[in-house]
Design a protein with these regions (language model features):
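Gly/Ser/Thr-rich active-site cleft segment
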Residues: 1-94, 187-237
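C-terminal, non-catalytic interaction/recognition modules in large multi-subunit enzymes and RNPs
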Residues: 4, 8, 16, 92, ...
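A polyampholytic, Gly/Pro-enriched intrinsically disordered region
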Residues: 36-50, 88-92, 110-113, 320-336
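Short glycine-aspartate micro-motif
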Residues: 89, 114-118, 158-160
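Phosphate-handling active-site elements
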Residues: 106-115, 136, 301-306
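Gly/Thr-rich phosphate-binding beta-strand-loop-beta motif of the actin/hexokinase/Hsp70
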Residues: 108-130, 167-171, 292
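Short helix-loop-beta connector
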Residues: 109-112, 273-277
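Basic, amphipathic juxtamembrane/active-site segments
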Residues: 127-148
Length: 527
């Protein structure tokens, strides 16, 4: 029926772009299938003009290569692919953070699983890497969950909450402190920017505590107004709560941290990951303000702050592969397994994946195709993704292979398996990845900032109050020279707060490795 509708539209409205749901998002769930199709169709005219204009401008500038665009599946595709399916570009930026996290973890982490967070000015994005693979979800939203539109399209699982460096601190009528979800944004921005902001933010609190140098923000390009931040916190937070400005600033960071910890707890529980056995990677310009506190609260043994952490998602784009996911519906189960039908669907997926790789000219040795089945126990409502090997489902024991793989995946996520239940397979996916270049390292180009390797300044810490701490220049830390907090590690792009008794060092690959320690999980409001 959809194909016939397309024929009629092409006859009567030639040139008008059409999106067919069975091609874009074959799903049994009508709402998700419909909403993703509507979103994609509405974006096609806009993205066609945008991509066309971009390619024309680059051609005029002398660029003769291919334009690649990021996708929400953690890959890049040719610009023409985005024209055909612009929904691929939704939420593509945050989807790159776990790609960078996976790369960094492979270099400097011994844990199998990794939690990745990216703290910007307005949002806090959390994602995961499980044993080198980035989990997907079908529950991505265009804005706040349940208050915006569900995309219904498979993408990297990223949970976002309104908690960033620009999050506004406020006290409600009952005397309870909140941080966010409102944000000062970049305009007018935090009070300390001096651009008209009047509401105290996380950045203002960090400035009052001495965690940010007012004369070295963005390497000294912006001078911050400490006095204005102090006044705003005193008037809007400290006064109503009966606290000193420093205690109020600490409280702001505590509440901010708890919002983030809750977001991490939600996604790790949903994906069956134990934070106490996972490393955690902090990225984004504001991550360093509470990354150690977050890691300690979650019980993570190791915290990594990449040298490129302030641009974590951009770094992920640098090391991502060209690739795309393909999906086919085919329902079968472990008690009456249709081997021939499954084999046909896997062949379709393989053909589509190989055609994609051929289109970009990727050599076979640089191309990998991963297969997944979306499966569930009989009569359950939701499926989980189960990694499979296509060749294992073509033999006489295909049903047993599917059943055992599902039981293992279900137990890993939910700590439970039901050997006696029938396993239903609903849909089949292939993810093709084409490596276009070997990236040896993610490093920031060296620049003589004129900063000394170690300085000192006053900073406020829970339990000890205002004290003089060393401030280390990130880029000048010697590899594997172990140091202990309290301290601040500073670069042109971020400030990393290291509480007392926490050890840290810089790895040979340039990343900061921190052992948070359980002692730092105490809440500063109790100090």
């Amino acid at each position: 029926h959809e194909l016939r509708v397309e024929e009629i539209l092409n006859e009567r409205l030639p040139g008008v772009p059409v999106t067919l749901s069975h091609r874009l998002n074959p799903s049994l769930r009508e709402y998700r299938r419909t909403i993703s199709t509507a979103i994609d169709a509405s974006l096609k005219p806009l993205m066609d003009r945008y991509i066309g204009g971009l390619e024309a401008a680059m051609l005029d500038a002398g660029f003769s290569g291919k334009v690649l665009v990021l996708t929400s599946q953690g890959t890049m595709v040719n610009a023409d692919e985005i024209r055909r399916a612009p929904i691929l570009a939704l939420n593509s930026g945050p989807s790159m953070a776990p790609i960078a996290g996976n790369y960094v973890a492979a270099t400097d982490s011994s844990e199998a699983d990794t939690i990745v967070f990216d703290t910007g000015g307005t949002t806090f994005d959390v994602s995961l890497v499980r044993a080198g693979h980035v989990p997907f979800t079908h529950e991505s939203w265009l804005g706040r969950p349940y208050q915006s539109d569900l995309t219904g399209f498979p993408s990297v699982d990223v949970k976002s909450v309104g908690a960033g460096g620009g999050s506004i601190a406020w006290v409600d009528d009952g005397g309870v402190l909140h941080v966010g979800p409102q944000s000062a944004g970049s305009v007018p921005g935090p009070v300390c920017y001096g651009a008209g902001g009047t509401e105290p933010t996380v950045s203002d609190a960090a400035l009052v505590l001495g965690y940010i140098d007012p004369d070295y923000f963005l390497g000294g390009r912006i001078r911050l107004d400490l006095a204005a931040s102090r006044r705003a916190i005193a008037d809007k937070v400290a006064g109503p709560l009966g606290l000193s400005s420093e205690a109020a600033a600490l409280a702001i960071l505590d509440v901010w941290t708890e919002n983030m910890v809750q977001a991490i707890s939600d996604i790790t529980v949903n994906q069956g990951i134990d934070p106490t056995t996972a490393s955690i990677i902090g990225g984004g310009g504001a991550a360093g303000l509470n990354a150690v506190a977050i890691a300690a609260r979650m019980g993570c043994p190791t915290l990594l702050i990449p040298e490129v952490g302030a641009g974590l998602s951009a770094a992920g784009a640098v090391v991502s592969d060209v690739g795309r996911g393909f999906r086919r519906l085919f329902v079968t189960n472990s008690s009456a397994f249709d081997t021939a039908g499954v084999r046909a669907k896997l062949a379709e997926l393989r053909t589509a994946a190989e055609a994609f790789a051929a289109q970009i000219g990727a050599p076979a040795e640089a191309t990998a195709i991963d297969y997944f089945v979306e499966a569930r126990y009989a009569h359950q409502v939701w499926e989980i993704d189960v990694a499979i090997k296509a060749e294992d489902l073509e033999g006489p024991n295909a049903a047993e292979v599917l059943r055992d793989a599902f039981h293992d995946a279900h137990e890993r996520i939910f700590a439970f398996r039901d050997e006696g239940s029938i396993v239903e397979a609903i849909a089949w996916r292939a993810q093709v990845r084409c490596k276009i270049a070997e990236t040896t390292e993610l490093r920031i180009a060296s620049e003589d900032t004129g900063e000394t390797a170690v300085r000192n300044r006053q900073a406020y810490f829970a339990g000890i109050g205002l004290t003089e701490v060393p401030v280390y220049a990130f880029e000048r830390l010697s590899a594997d020279d172990v140091r202990t907090g309290p301290a601040i590690v500073e670069s042109r792009f971020t400030s990393i707060v290291v509480p007392p008794a926490v050890t840290f060092r810089r790895s040979p690959s340039g990343n900061l490795i921190v052992q948070p320690g359980a002692a730092n999980a105490t809440n500063s409001l109790k100090s």
